[in-house]
Amino acid sequence: SWMNPMSSPENAASGNRSVEQPAAGRPAAIAAELVSGGSLEMGAHRPQDARDIAALLPAGTPVYVNHLPRHRLLDTLPTLVAVREAGLEPVPHIAARRIKDRAELQTFLSRAVGDAGVRKALILGGDEAEAIGAYADGAALIREGLLASSGLREIGLPGYPEGHPRIQRAVL
């Protein structure tokens, strides 16, 4: 049995307040407790999973939607919309080397902000050896200026504390 250390007579006498007992035996409540203040990542090709995921998470939880190789950035839009409609916060991965051109990026940002209510994006280089368009890395995407004028309120950047196999340490 679980005992709350804050509910001991000594703590009660000293004015310490007790804490709530964990949600034992309720998977949805346990999952919500574990991710409180956290985030989750889901595949962009599974918009139908958004409602099931939302049933396990607190409303407004950030859900990062990946941008996989061989897929267009616009292919992530149905999942971003489904995440927003499920009451969660959609956060797209934007992989610079996978973007064909400025028009593709501009169309995506306009629709992501307008249709899915995207406020934040994670800017990545992408693991391709060669860029398919003008953006060699996340920094080039940021310098381009469309992110700043898109309506996004925040961007996230990856960190590689142990290094990255395709990025020289000096660049990191």
Model-inferred region functions:
Residues A12-A13, A23:
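Ala/Thr-enriched low-complexity intrinsically disordered regions
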Residues S7-S8, G15:
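Intrinsically disordered, low-complexity segments enriched in small polar residues
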Residues P27-L172:
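Active-site beta->alpha loop and helix N-cap motifs at the rims of alpha/beta catalytic domains
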Residues G15-N16, R26:
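Compositionally biased non-globular segments, especially hydrophobic aliphatic-rich helices
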